[in-house]
Regions:
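Juxtamembrane helix-loop-helix connectors linking adjacent transmembrane helices
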Residues: 61-131
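Membrane-water interface at transmembrane helix exits
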Residues: 25-26, 51, 56, 92, ...
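Alpha-helical transmembrane spans of integral membrane proteins, capturing the lipid-embedded, hydrophobic core
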Residues: 15-23, 41, 45, 81-90, ...
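Membrane-helix interfacial "entry" motifs
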Residues: 3, 7, 29, 33, ...
């Protein structure tokens, strides 16, 4: 358990405010007419860098490290976890196609069509990188990384992954949507484990990019 006597109160209060805002914004996804879930990433990034500023004064190691990227990648078990979303992306599409008879691929395309330019490959590659990096800074770097200072890891991992999955809800049948957000939850748990082991959201971002790129490539081949 964290030693609360050693935690800066300003950082704790700032973290709680950021967590609350991200949670509320994610939950608005349940009501399509009210959905403001797209703001969760912006809020998470903002609070991440505010807390990084506080941490720098306290000489606390950053959760976004370029210089130690390769050293963090080589930490025990990290590379295997980074590559795991390649398998989950393929399995998600294969199982989804078997269960929903092609409707799952259409559902994913519909969910991502407004954010990704499938007809412009160079732009699509940039969008995949930016989207994954932004989500990792917000959800792993801030929500998971900063909340882990005041709460147990697995509680933070499950809560952040649940909200992350809810923020990706898209219209469709109950079964289709439930399967989609469950697999997003699974991937999010993997990213959380990567962050826990590496302490660097650039590493979880790499895994996120690889996983998304694999899924999109398979979708384009399938379509």
């Amino acid at each position: 358990m964290p030693d609360f006597a050693k935690i800066d109160k300003k950082s704790v209060y700032t973290t709680i405010i950021g967590l609350f805002l991200m949670a509320v914004l994610s939950l608005t996804k349940i009501i399509p007419e009210l959905s403001l879930s797209g703001l969760t990433v912006l809020i998470g990034i903002l609070f991440f860098f505010v807390l990084e500023h506080f941490d720098k004064k306290s000489h606390i190691e950053s959760g976004l490290r370029f210089k130690s990227f390769f050293d963090d990648l080589k930490k025990q078990g990290v590379i295997l976890l980074v590559l795991l979303p390649v398998g989950t992306a393929a399995a998600t599409l294969l199982i989804g196609d078997m269960i929903f008879k092609g409707a799952f691929a259409s559902h994913i395309l519909g969910r991502t069509d407004g954010m990704l330019s499938f007809d412009k490959i160079p732009l699509l590659m940039v969008q995949i990188v930016i989207a994954a990096l932004g989500e990792e800074i917000a959800w792993r770097g801030f929500f998971l990384g900063k909340s882990m200072r005041i709460l147990p890891f697995w509680l933070c991992a499950i809560l952040s992954s649940l909200l992350f999955a809810i923020a990706h809800i898209s219209s469709g049948s109950v079964g289709l949507v439930s399967y989609d957000i469950f697999m997003i939850f699974v991937d999010s748990i993997i990213y959380a484990m990567i962050y826990k082991k590496s302490g660097n959201c650039l590493i979880s971002a790499l895994s996120h990019i690889i996983g998304n790129a694999t899924g999109i490539l398979l979708l384009m081949m399938y379509s």
